[in-house]
Structure formats: structure tokens, C-alpha cells
Amino acid sequence: YFCGGFVKLVYIVVRPSKVEVVKSALAAINIGGATLFDVRGFGASRGHTSSYRGSQYVTDTNPKGMLMVACKDDDVPNIIQAVRDVANTGSIGDGKIFVNELSDVIRIRTGETGEDAIMEKNND
């Protein structure tokens, strides 16, 4: 089942307020799908103060949105640019993009593998 390393897995971690514009930016460059997660993280911005029922508390993590995209190797530069164009505010906490190699992708319904499994089809 090895697809030859031509498929990448891109993790895009952004502010929750940027998830919808990132989804739109990916659609505009013909990225057919993504898996979305609500996540929490910390980095240079070490948390924030919140209030709950009148009490103030400090949390050491920040809410983030994460999109996971399996794509062709050639799509990665366009994905990175599209995300940076819409998610960059110039402030700490804008997020990160992680790019990994996938050893394979299998479409459960058809058994297609590799790039064939991630290519959007009209009937999928």
C-alpha cells in the first residue's frame, strides 16, 4: 500500500476566529476537504485571563482551531501561502503549520490509495 511519499499531511493550527476564512481559502485553491478539531495549546502566548460566573481565572492554554489536510506534495506551497494570507494578524498566537509525509492514504469505500484516495470526485 505504500504510495511513494507523494502525499503530505498538513496540520494548520490557527485562532478559532480564523477557521472559517482558512476553510474558504483552501476551497479557493481547490483543496477538497479537511478534518477540523477544536484544540488547546500554549507557546509564546502563555494563556489568558477568563471569567466564569463572576470569578476571574487564568488558564495556561489558549483555544485554537486545527485543520488537517491530506494533499498532494505539489499543493503544499499553495496551502501555506493561502493560510498565511488569511490567518496572519502579525500578533503572537497566529498559529503554526506543520507538514508531514504520509506513508499512505486509503479511501475506505473504494480501496483507492495514495493521491487517488485524496482527489475529490464528483460522487464522493
Can you describe what each PLM-predicted range is?
Residues Y1-D124:
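Positively charged, small/polar-rich N-terminal and surface patches that mediate targeting and assembly
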